[in-house]
């Protein structure tokens, strides 16, 4: 019996039947048509849906298993990287041992691009690609669920309550242990929801959940058996910086953020097509946990993620601007801004970006960029 059937990604023999099914899904074809041909779809919806269907069928006609669909996705990634980044670099890949599989826990800045960039690095380095944890809050439509599970994503049920939630989390944890034991790499974000303020913190509750799959072991031993490697994704420019600042401003001024059905989709699309500049993916060191305190273990992961964060001029310019208006913390050690040589080109680029944003959002946007510098200084990783 396949007890993971309802949450796991689709397997080789399921790929083609699922593809053939969603290629007939009118709602999906409408979404694809609006993405590729927004203006024409408004005036000629049926014609453009047929055009989208033809385009998709051509792209996936040779897809028959997981590997062939990942090859198609790699082509999309290549184009996205070419269009939205200036550089894509990595560090620490040499630490990954051949024949060993890992649970990668990364900071969370972008809904889909975080795991996509980690996956891209592994794919091109010849490592096994990721099984990706994705929350059911993003899977509002059946065709979206299908698309995610076609691309090696497994489902995290966040909308359940009480006993159902507990059983679901145990199954999820068992699945991740099963993956690592059976030579699959896994990715999960360090927290539920993206870091809107540029502060990357691991949720201790996540670590408790990860340990549930091996109740025969102590918490630290269970986590150690997952071969956990912290990963840091650094974006020179956050494609969703304005959207995040708007959310934080609304929480500050109104007490809460009103999310619509389109909020996540808007963030996903903006994250994919928005300008990112230099993106760096840093693979940390595999962790062996000697403690069973989830708060202490979360701090160990956080320290690696922060230390490996690659700072860009955008981070220092943001801190400089906050300092000029008296908003930067007064207890920052050293005078790191005096020693950072910032290019005129990067200054102009940042100025242009911030001028396009409503002034009421500037403070939140600037802290989103400045906080990695501030936290590195406070933690002694930057002197």
Report residues per predicted region.
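Flexible, glycine/proline-enriched loop segments at strand-loop-helix junctions
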Residues: 159-166, 194-200
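Membrane-interfacial terminal anchoring regions of lipid-handling membrane enzymes
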Residues: 1-102, 108-131, 136-142, 170-186, ...
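Acidic beta-strand-to-loop metal/phosphate-binding motif
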Residues: 189
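Eukaryotic endomembrane system proteins
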Residues: 149-152, 181-184, 192
């Amino acid at each position: 019996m396949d007890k993971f059937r309802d949450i796991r990604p689709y397997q080789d023999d399921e790929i083609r039947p699922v593809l053939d099914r969603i290629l007939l899904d009118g709602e999906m074809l409408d979404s694809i048509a609006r993405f590729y041909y927004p203006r024409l779809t408004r005036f000629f919806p049926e014609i453009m849906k047929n055009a989208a269907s033809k385009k998709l069928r051509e792209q996936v006609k040779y897809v028959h298993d997981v590997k062939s669909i990942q090859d198609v996705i790699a082509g999309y990634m290549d184009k996205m990287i070419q269009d939205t980044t200036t550089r894509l670099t990595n560090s620490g890949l040499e630490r990954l041992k051949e024949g060993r599989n890992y649970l990668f826990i990364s900071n969370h800045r972008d809904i889909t691009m975080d795991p996509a960039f980690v996956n891209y690095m592994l794919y091109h380095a010849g490592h096994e690609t990721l099984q990706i944890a994705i929350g059911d809050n993003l899977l509002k439509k059946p065709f979206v669920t299908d698309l995610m599970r076609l691309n090696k994503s497994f489902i995290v049920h966040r909308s359940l309550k009480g006993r159902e939630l507990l059983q679901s989390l145990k199954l999820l944890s068992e699945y991740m242990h099963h993956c690592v034991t059976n030579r699959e790499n896994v990715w999960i974000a360090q927290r539920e929801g993206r870091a809107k303020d540029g502060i990357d913190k691991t949720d201790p509750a996540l670590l408790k959940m990860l340990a549930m799959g091996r109740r025969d072991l102590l918490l630290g031993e269970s986590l150690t058996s997952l071969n956990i490697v912290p990963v840091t994704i650094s974006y020179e420019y956050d494609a969703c910086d304005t959207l995040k600042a708007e959310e934080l401003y609304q929480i500050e001024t109104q007490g809460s953020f009103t999310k619509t059905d389109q909020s996540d989709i808007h963030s996903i699309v903006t994250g994919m097509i928005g300008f990112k500049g230099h993106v760096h993916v840093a693979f940390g060191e595999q962790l062996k946990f000697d403690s069973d305190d989830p708060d202490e273990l979360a701090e160990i992961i956080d320290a690696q993620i922060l230390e490996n964060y690659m700072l860009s001029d955008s981070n220092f310019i943001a801190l400089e601007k906050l300092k000029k208006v008296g908003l930067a913390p007064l207890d920052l050690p050293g005078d790191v801004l005096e020693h950072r040589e910032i290019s005129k080109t990067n200054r102009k680029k940042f100025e242009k970006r911030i001028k396009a944003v409503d002034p009421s959002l500037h403070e939140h946007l600037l802290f989103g960029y400045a906080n990695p510098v501030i936290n590195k200084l406070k933690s002694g990783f930057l002197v």
